[in-house]
Amino acid sequence: MSISIPEELLLSDDDIPDMPDMLESEVVCALAELVGVLLIDIDIPDIELLPIDILAIDDIVDANVLLALDIASMLIDDMLDNIVLLALDIASMLIDAILDATVLDALDMASIFMLLPIFIPSILNVKYNTLFFIFYSILPTNVI
């Protein structure tokens, strides 16, 4: 005995939005189990009740698809939040590294300026105090 189901009661491919394959297969398995349980309760000789049961199954399928889409969107939101936080962490680490390198470069430059008065007198054979005074009088005040 074959049972024909009216076309307007069936879901088309356009009614169900696309989902990731893994999530879709889990939803399909869950729906198959649910539909199987509901179909057992259908009394086959009462053909008049069959469309009502199919409508109930259709509503359950729609609700499960919407629930699956909600879960998928929450998972995607969590992934995006984690990616944004990771990107911000990486950006802050890079900024810290750049600032550290800049500070180290500034300290290197300051140490070079501080050591110059010590080495120049030996090269030029000039008294240390005189050159020290001349060198620091030439430098701007914010460098000292």
From Swiss-Prot:
It is found in: Membrane. The chain crosses the membrane at residues 27-47, 49-69, 83-103, 106-126. Keywords: Membrane, Transmembrane, Transmembrane helix. It is a multi-pass membrane protein. GO terms for cellular component: membrane. Almost completely overlaps CTR1. This is Putative uncharacterized protein YPR123C. It comes from Saccharomyces cerevisiae (strain ATCC 204508 / S288c).
